[in-house]
Structures are given as structure tokens and as C-alpha cells.
């Protein structure tokens, strides 16, 4: 069994991820660690705490109508929507409905929204919530999908991000490479 280290969030010590050191290849990048964020995505308390950190970047400045969830981030997305819509006289979204949706992959590997969800994206201010951002390719695909369906991207939120921006859009994350000793990521052709 591989050894892991637990990494606690600087903003909330109740939030933690497990990092396994090794050489891990994805379709888009090679990484020095595998980050297990399963508990944060599926455990009630951790998902709620994660949303509590991420909401601070958007609640007072950005109107969000829809949260597009990627990579199994729907539980966090639901708590995030609740925090955004909470009755707070300073919140831009106070008392508003916030949709939480997930695109699907079609038979060609393209991200799509089914007809019954397009109205929740078209003409809406959208926050992209993604579990991890390493190279930014999955985020770019989601951004293209949001744009195709007429949504207006307001930001990107992530549990972990190895990069600060995707195509000039800031990525607000709970964890970054600075939190994980020795973390490195590289594009496939640049792998050492």
C-alpha cells in the first residue's frame, strides 16, 4: 500500500485531502502526486466547509445564476448554491435561485447539456466548479461548452488547482501546489 500524507487547508483545518507521492499520468498531464479528494466531494460536512471557503470569492461581487459542476463536484456545488442564495443583505445573490447542473459527454466526447438543462445555462451568469485543475484542458472544454450554450462565465472554482488562471480566468481554489511538498505537474510531452 502506498503511503500518503494528509494536507489540511490553511483556511479551515477541518478540510483535508490525501496526497500520494509517485508518478501519475492523466490524459493531459503527468503529476508527482495523486490527490484524493473523495471525502471532500461526498462527505456532507467537508463539502459544506469547502463551499464555505469557495463562496467568499463570489458572494459579494459576482452574480451567479448557475453552477456548472465537473468531476463529481455536485455535492460541493449544491452547498455553494445554498451559500450564494442565502438571505444576506450584502450578497449579490441574496434570495435568488441558483441552478446546479452537470454537462454530459456525447458519443464523440463533446460536452453537452441536454435540452431540459439548456435554459439553466443560456443567458445565465455561470460559475464553473471543478474538482482539480492541472493543465486546464478539462476546464477549457467546460468553458467552451458554457460559451456554446450561451452562458457567461463568471469564474472558476476548484478544490485543487495547479494553475492560477485558465485563459485569463482566475481559478479560486482551496488547495494549490504550495500546500503539497514536492508537488509537480507537467504536460505529457514535457514530463521529466
Please report, for each region that a protein language model flagged, where it lies by residue.
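Short, well-ordered alpha-helices that flank and scaffold nucleotide-derived cofactor binding pockets
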Residues: 56, 82, 86, 144, ...
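Conserved acidic residues
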Residues: 65, 124, 154
